Amino acid sequence: MLIFPAIDLYDKKVVRLYKGDYSQMTIYSENPLQVAKDFQNAGATCIHIVDLEGAKFGTTPNLEIVKQIAQNTRLFIEVGGGIRNIETIKKYLDCGVNRVILGTAAVIDQEFLKKALNLYGDKIAVGVDVKDGLVAIKGWEEKSTYDCYEFCGLMQSLGVKNIICTDISKDGAMQGTNRQLYQELSKMFSLDITASGGVSTLDDVISLKNLNLYGAIIGKAYYIGSIKLQDALEAVR
């Protein structure tokens, strides 16, 4: 299982939200490139970046920072947040990003998703953000009508290979992961599943590894020191 340490960007800073709430934002660093270099120095091979401003407004205000990280590290980079057209996908891939995560766009515009998959194949992943059992959109501020399992089935049928599944109720709350959700998804679908939200302890990392998931994202737990990145990487080797 791969470990994806996370950088959430807002106003060119590294931040974390509590349960997806923009009014509960903590700034952890004003130097995202240094944070990414720290990940690499700890042994990480990949990184998960979310542009929270992009997710909220559908723009790319932090593109330059992502580009700096791509140019100055050897990390495999996946990026999500506000990517709602082919032009934005191209911008990210052209600046050195390896995989682009579609969230809202995959839910509300499946013709666009099909086009993106057709053009870029496995460079496209889909973020499945779950709130009260339904898939959330627009920076987690609205809920769609899709149930999580129905939506994952649809994604698989459209040719999506890789999903990042976040339980919003767990995200940033440091209360553990929704192991049952990931267990059910991995049994039902042949998707590469990355778990996100609530990975708080080394035990969480190990229990996700035992589900044979593709990846796990570590965010707040790294920033507050409850998981050492080296320990997490060691645990999944």
Model-derived regions, located:
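Glycine/small-residue-rich loop that forms an oxyanion/phosphate-binding "nest" at active or ligand-binding sites
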Residues: E53, P61-N118
